[in-house]
A protein has these predicted regions:
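Extracytoplasmic thiol/disulfide redox context detector
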Residues: 2-92, 115, 125, 184, ...
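A structure-centric signal for secondary-structure junctions around beta-strands
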Residues: 43, 194-195
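A cytosolic small-molecule/anion-sensing beta-strand core signal
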Residues: 50, 200-201
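Cysteine-centric redox/oxidoreductase cores and disulfide-bonded domains
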Residues: 86-194, 201-203, 208-212, 219-222
Length: 222
């Protein structure tokens, strides 16, 4: 038996799997602050505009996350860019938290808040008038901290390895808030109608706001 040859073939297979896994795990931050998952030099770039208070965005993430990343991103032929279209103060607070800390933490922060959206949006719908008043008065940092307290964001971030001072630093990061505002302004400038919305290689996909429709577009182009 040719054990060296068999071992070499097995090693090649393992290296191929590792390479595919590396593309799926690769995350790059663009100059605008958006996050690019996969091969940054991929021939095709899919851009997703996301709002954390958008229920359709949470639905899309549940339906599309695995097939999109494991089928399309893993190959290295397509990269996924996540940009923010901030539509309200809660959305801004969550976006600041998903972007909190090292870039490597973004994707799981992003997924955690989307998967738990029903719980924290449910809390937002049942807060008292006094609590809501804290969200709209005082310095921006104090307003965001009040939201984080009332909606359970400190506990969510603690489970992700952040202590309260680290969360407070991110909620006070006005440079980050400005980058998120710039991404939102860019979305408005190019005519993004709402979230989720998608671009392929910079071209806005009209009428494409769910996984079924997007998947058909991807199959037609790749």
């Amino acid at each position: 038996m040719h054990f060296p040859k068999i071992a070499a073939l097995a090693l090649c297979a393992l290296l191929a799997i590792a390479a595919r896994g590396d593309w799926n795990a690769r995350l790059t931050v663009s100059p605008s602050g958006s996050h690019i998952i996969g091969n940054p030099a991929a021939a095709t770039r899919l851009t997703e505009y996301i709002s954390y208070t958008c229920s359709h965005c949470a639905d899309f993430d549940r339906q599309a996350s695995d097939p999109l990343r494991l089928v399309y991103v893993t190959s290295g032929k397509l990269s996924l860019e996540i940009r923010h279209l901030v539509r309200d103060p809660i959305d801004l607070a969550v976006a600041m938290l998903t972007n909190c800390g090292p870039p490597a933490k973004f994707l799981q922060n992003h997924t955690t808040f989307l998967r738990q959206q029903a719980q924290w949006l449910g809390r937002a719908g049942s807060v008292s008038p006094g609590q809501k008043a804290r969200w709209s008065s005082g310095p921006a940092m104090a307003r965001r901290r009040a939201m984080a307290d009332d909606l359970g964001f400190y506990q969510t971030m603690q489970a992700r390895g952040y202590d309260r001072p680290a969360v407070d630093r991110c909620l006070a990061d006005e440079a980050m808030a400005s980058r998120l505002a710039e991404q939102t302004d860019e979305a408005v400038r190019i005519g993004v109608p709402g979230t989720p919305s998608f671009l392929i290689d910079g071209e806005l996909l009209t009428g494409t706001h769910d996984w079924q429709t997007l998947q058909a577009q991807l199959k037609a182009r790749l």
